[in-house]
Amino acid sequence: QTQSFFYSLELGWKSQLFVTTTGRNDWASQLANSPQKSFFYPSVGVSWLPSSTFNFPEKFNYLKIRASWASVANPFPRELTIATHPYDDTISGWDDKSNYPIGQLYPERTKTWELGFDARFLHGFTLSASWYRADTYNQTFNPNLSASSGYSDIYIQTGHVRNTGVEASLGYDHQWK
């Protein structure tokens, strides 16, 4: 079960500068007996329309510059921090716990940065480009253990994955009359 709180706030100034922020806090039952009882993930975005601030030539009629940062989280699988035994319907009884006892687990996190712009020019062309970087850590894995350990697997949190990239699109919108 997950209980959550969410907010969103958007502010604009003179139709040219905008700030958006969001936040969510989750209290997930998967976090029982873990050092972190809830997790908060915020975001903030800023955009500016220089084409509304300055007088641009008619052939270059729109420009938006944007930046954002966000942090998101996922809880780990259920019942990992509670010493419970799974119920097996096929035998109408409780199975032995097969995973090695766990220490401290934390929610998986991804933090993302993005910078970009959107433009319209020459009566129908559009150009959008973005650079992004996403860092993910506290990933939960369960590698197999040797049968001699008495357990089949162990849950560990490890790794740091970084994704970086550039996205761009060029378009043309023309209406035949």
Language-model region placement:
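Extracellular/periplasmic, surface-exposed regions of secreted and cell-surface proteins
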Residues: 1-177
